[in-house]
Amino acid sequence: MASLVYSPFTLSTSKAEHLSSLTNSTKHSFLRKKHRSTKPAKSFFKVKSAVSGNGLFTQTNPEVRRIVPIKRDNVPTVKIVYVVLEAQYQSSLSEAVQSLNKTSRFASYEVVGYLVEELRDKNTYNNFCEDLKDANIFIGSLIFVEELAIKVKDAVEKERDRMDAVLVFPSMPEVMRLNKLGSFSMSQLGQSKSPFFQLFKRKKQGSAGFADSMLKLVRTLPKVLKYLPSDKAQDARLYILSLQFWLGGSPDNLQNFVKMISGSYVPALKGVKIEYSDPVLFLDTGIWHPLAPTMYDDVKEYWNWYDTRRDTNDSLKRKDATVVGLVLQRSHIVTGDDSHYVAVIMELEARGAKVVPIFAGGLDFSGPVEKYFVDPVSKQPIVNSAVSLTGFALVGGPARQDHPRAIEALKKLDVPYLVAVPLVFQTTEEWLNSTLGLHPIQVALQVALPELDGAMEPIVFAGRDPRTGKSHALHKRVEQLCIRAIRWGELKRKTKAEKKLAITVFSFPPDKGNVGTAAYLNVFASIFSVLRDLKRDGYNVEGLPENAETLIEEIIHDKEAQFSSPNLNVAYKMGVREYQDLTPYANALEENWGKPPGNLNSDGENLLVYGKAYGNVFIGVQPTFGYEGDPMRLLFSKSASPHHGFAAYYSYVEKIFKADAVLHFGTHGSLEFMPGKQVGMSDACFPDSLIGNIPNVYYYAANNPSEATIAKRRSYANTISYLTPPAENAGLYKGLKQLSELISSYQSLKDTGRGPQIVSSIISTAKQCNLDKDVDLPDEGLELSPKDRDSVVGKVYSKIMEIESRLLPCGLHVIGEPPSAMEAVATLVNIAALDRPEDEISALPSILAECVGREIEDVYRGSDKGILSDVELLKEITDASRGAVSAFVEKTTNSKGQVVDVSDKLTSLLGFGINEPWVEYLSNTKFYRANRDKLRTVFGFLGECLKLVVMDNELGSLMQALEGKYVEPGPGGDPIRNPKVLPTGKNIHALDPQAIPTTAAMASAKIVVERLVERQKLENEGKYPETIALVLWGTDNIKTYGESLGQVLWMIGVRPIADTFGRVNRVEPVSLEELGRPRIDVVVNCSGVFRDLFINQMNLLDRAIKMVAELDEPVEQNFVRKHALEQAEALGIDIREAATRVFSNASGSYSANISLAVENSSWNDEKQLQDMYLSRKSFAFDSDAPGAGMAEKKQVFEMALSTAEVTFQNLDSSEISLTDVSHYFDSDPTNLVQSLRKDKKKPSSYIADTTTANAQVRTLSETVRLDARTKLLNPKWYEGMMSSGYEGVREIEKRLSNTVGWSATSGQVDNWVYEEANSTFIQDEEMLNRLMNTNPNSFRKMLQTFLEANGRGYWDTSAENIEKLKELYSQVEDKIEGIDR
């Protein structure tokens, strides 16, 4: 452990002496000489870890945070209490006061300090309040978290009038208003018209601008003072001087600050003349190097000094040496808390990189970046990569950020941008011991927010000394950071011809039929497109085949390979000794996998690396996780690890192939999900060890920002988004199409006497299509009244329109291929279907409904009820929307069907009258009176969206990344909900985790919850559900800005409260009167990805649920309290622990692994799956110990689940539905809940579908049927997949396998689904042969899945069908073996 810490008492003597000499040589005139002891520190790592206590922050030792006054006769004591964000001020102020106490004859000072985050702890806050009771002076700085700002305000406000002085420097307005010095007060902050007070109104415009305005105020003091009343001028002057002292931050400045304030305002010192010096001012921005004689404001002067240094090695003298720019906080420099900065600079230079370390005194670093990193004449960067060591966003720091300004500066700089993390709210030991890694607050402020600027690589490089609160470098982490920064910089410097690239593809589950697994991506067609582009651009891609099909064959089985293999093509055989030499952590894998080589990716003697090289490009197949065949091992292995073959692959890529970069191709592999800390990894975490020093570029689906963020944080990836296939309407086929025609006939002929016969045909055909499972149908229609006939037809029509209009992605995307015109139409129609009040854009269907005197919501409701006239009107609105958008797009389409020249076309289209194609189209429909102004607004918006849809930057961004350039960041999510996701090719990020749920998300959440509750009441004799077990997904909450999170809050009856910055850190209970129903208990299963990204919101949820459990309300109106009291008594625990309801995996672990068992058929019975779920998902988050990680609470979990009457999940976008991925059934507890309930009653299972403007709540079985009809059994979908060949067959097989997963976890799949699938893919000889010949391995898995569904009792079919499946299985086995031979 000690080797991680880069400080004199843990280094070798020579290293310590070297650093000591460096330190002594870096003293500046503004820093007093400090003695550094070379004696070993006693019990350096024996401070009690917070992880074993309440999980909050370990407070620094008394000698730092509490200075006891020296008692002298007749010398008054002055007590100062302070609260600061940054620990460097704590140590600097302590040093200043300790020195003052030794020399002062006029006063003795008692100082008590708190870091702002410490005030979350109840006991610490109480101590703070007690300390304030006899304090003379209070100081606060950088208090920007609202809940803590309120706590500080409440405590200080009580003592403000009594205290002699209250000084608050840049913080939230409610804290700033506490300021008072004599007659100077800020209690009316923001209400005065004077320039001084108007300054603070800028707080709302952004904290970075606010802080920089304060600095400007300091520089322009004389001008400001003339606007102040004369009686306040002197006190205001002293406040400004205080700010100057504080920003100066050095012990000398802070000592003079204490002298000035105490001498001016403490009554006991009135009449005593206390001398103090003026503040020593430093550059607001500049360049600082620990060996330089001064700070520099000019880059040329800095280089003049740098190039004349005599202490540099030969590497630094090379003109082509890599140059790394560093961004530093001035406060660390001026307070002397800079040893971690020194360590990074020294490490970079020792490795041959030149360094330009810049700093800023405010919160906006964009100006210094442009000023010092970019040549003012050529506008070219003078650095090859940039690393921020602040740990904060480039503009705004820990307060309100200005990401557009940051992005603009970084685009001008155009180099890779890394943000490393110094531990601010944890000590080193806390971080090392924590399974979470970084504390939730640090993740939000120091990881999530910089990512919005385009930052990568959140490597923890500095810790905090628990004795002094000062920073120290973590040596191994500093090495990792510096090497990676240099490697990113080398991409800028190296020629294309010499760069080596390792493209990594995935195969999951492991099988030849699955090589090239990636969500919605035709992997090999895309790789071929990338390689062709690389070759044209000057990269060495020797031997590239002529097409993607040949490329697949060569990767799977190269006939001319050096090594023969029955599996994939072997690129390299690695002997055990070589593997151990190249893989320092190989021994750590032996606990789980034994001695190498093991039996995975091995021939028994060597470890095998699968793939093939084409010149300087290697295409390799990432080994699988290793537990696929035996997922039950994960139940018993507390220290899961990659296997030797997995480690060998990455050792080969880095140290034998010597890749300059690795490109992980598609969503997603296993690297980022390997065991280790959630965020802020150590060198003992497997993702960190595996990726080593290779720059990582990762193509990730634009609709999956949550897992992309995991890849960004845990595998240090520069994630580049790719488009998912644009959604199309499912359409109708076979009997469903016939039904549509019959309904059209009925509408035309119902009054001619043929109505009853047509209705009878509709009923008969609907039953043949199995719609009687969804619609209550009579036996026949002859005896029905006209009203009842309309009702039956309306309900059937509504159901088939639901199927027809269902959105689905057809086919697979190819990198670099823009959408066709028709694909653009489908996307734009769906974009137009949503209201966007924030942009004052009405939904197109709403505009059309309005012009015929209807509200679109009424039409939706009527259609849902099966009212025939409303179903027909909705169909007309839908058709008119498509037609109008098609007419618009056709004007921008060439003869090949591609969208071109959007900008020029739009200019001519957005005129008036007949030139507008949508007006022309609608003039021939019943909607000819639609509001033209509203139409013009929505089509103007669609025109902008169209430009984004057809823009292709996926290849361009990859080239930028490989050339060491900045890839512009952008949000991930659903492009229909949020068109800002487009164009793809962005460095994908999530969102500020503290910004959800938004107000709009809460409004949507309430609608869904009320519909869910009403539906359950309808089917449960009018009773409210007492408990709902539900799932929170990371991606869903990013796409919807927290809708499902909001659903949980509304179920229990609380509302989120946002602070000034829009951050949600508090909740308040909604009264039972307003709620109008009982508070419903919840059991929340958070996905591992949600846990990683939104642990602050898990904290919020847990606090909210426990708050509700403690409300003094009748238990029949508060089911949370009812169950918590029952469980507390049953388990002998307190009510807060019994109210634990927020669960997930253990830290660093993901999924229930039921999907692994199902995909590999490696389970015996459903109880085994249920045991896996309980073992993997019973880890609870505790808001009373937020830094302690996830703790196993299986008993509480089981008891909470046993009360559930409803299980519930959300679908939020058209791209991913229940059977598209295994995640949904992997997290479904339906059968488990049934087994835990005392009455053994199966809970109701519901799915909320918010993929369209008309949100629905369906049963699970209804949703599975809808999914089967629109995808698996739909020719439009499966033919679209077949057009992608090899990979398309795998997609079809995956849907069938996931359907079996739903049978296993819920029993909600109808027999006819399997029967129809068998008819579609097996009984059809032509289809059967296409599947077998295109991808025999995946077809074999499909046959196996059918047989398994029958064997497990999920599918009852004829003996003939089973016999045919067995015969086909034998045939395909022979075919595969023939291919292999």
Curated annotation (Swiss-Prot):
Coiled-coil boundaries: none
The organelle targeting sequence, given as a residue range: 1-49
Top-level taxon in the UniProt lineage: Eukaryota
UniProt EC number: 6.6.1.1
Consequence of substituting residue 642 to L: In cch; semi-dwarf plants with pale green leaves and ABA-insensitive stomatal movment
Disulfide bonds: none
Residue numbers bearing the N-acetylalanine modification: 50
Entry's localization field: Plastid, Chloroplast stroma; Plastid, Chloroplast membrane
Record flagged with keyword Transferase: no
Enzyme class: ligase
Annotated CDD domains: CobN_like (cd10150)
Protein keywords: Acetylation, ATP-binding, Chlorophyll biosynthesis, Chloroplast, Ligase, Membrane, Nucleotide-binding, Photosynthesis, Plastid, Transit peptide
Annotated membrane topology: Peripheral membrane protein
Signal peptide: none
Tissue and organ distribution: Widely expressed.
Cellular component aspect of the GO annotation: chloroplast; chloroplast inner membrane; chloroplast stroma; magnesium chelatase complex; mitochondrion; plastid
BP terms from Gene Ontology: chlorophyll biosynthetic process; photosynthesis
Single GO MF descriptor: ATP binding
Assembly information from the UniProt record: The magnesium chelatase complex is a heterotrimer consisting of subunits CHLI, CHLD and CHLH. Interacts with GUN4, WRKY18, WRKY40, WRKY60, CHLI1 and CHLD.
NCBIfam families per record: BchH, PRK12493.1
Further comment: Plants silencing CHLH show significant ABA-insensitive phenotypes in seed germination, post-germination growth arrest by ABA and ABA-induced promotion of stomatal closure and inhibition of stomatal opening. In contrast, plants over-expressing ABAR display ABA-hypersensitive phenotypes.
Similarity comment text for this entry: Belongs to the Mg-chelatase subunit H family.
Protein name, UniProt field: Magnesium-chelatase subunit ChlH, chloroplastic
Source organism: Arabidopsis thaliana
